[in-house]
């Protein structure tokens, strides 16, 4: 399981890569592995407002449908349109294939997220509970 050290993570298995005041958001390797083959990604529209901890979209796999939560609040400035026709790209490389880019309205939201080490610990606890 890959957990890049330069990203932030949420307890609900989303990742955040920050560049300036923008946040790229996707789901983690752990999440895509648990979901299995991804067949559909429902994404917000550009200019939609997202709340930290609020619903960002839905991801569907052959196993289940799962809500995607926004780790940070802000305005959607871009979506990964490639996922509309090829949602399986998330399975192939979850960290290269973001879901949305958000212009953050409160960079303090990042303080509520996990480091790579803390996220790895969370994943190990969840795996141990199965």
Curated annotation (Swiss-Prot):
Record's keyword annotation contains Transit peptide: no
Cofactor(s) needed for function: (R)-lipoate
Comment on bound cofactor: Binds 1 lipoyl cofactor covalently.
SUPFAM superfamilies, per database record: Single hybrid motif
Presence of keyword Lyase: no
CDD domains: GCS_H
InterPro entries to which the protein is assigned, alphabetical: 2-oxoA_DH_lipoyl-BS, Biotin_lipoyl, GCV_H, GCV_H/Fam206, GCV_H_sub, Single_hybrid_motif
Keywords assigned: Lipoyl
Location of the Lipoyl-binding domain: 22-103
One Pfam family of this chain: GCV_H
BP terms from Gene Ontology: glycine decarboxylation via glycine cleavage system
PROSITE patterns assigned to the protein according to its UniProt record, in alphabetical order: BIOTINYL_LIPOYL (PS50968), LIPOYL (PS00189)
N6-lipoyllysine: residues carrying this PTM: 63
Subunit structure as annotated in this protein's UniProt entry: The glycine cleavage system is composed of four proteins: P, T, L and H.
Similarity remark: Belongs to the GcvH family.
Record-given protein name: Glycine cleavage system H protein
Gene name linked to the record: gcvH
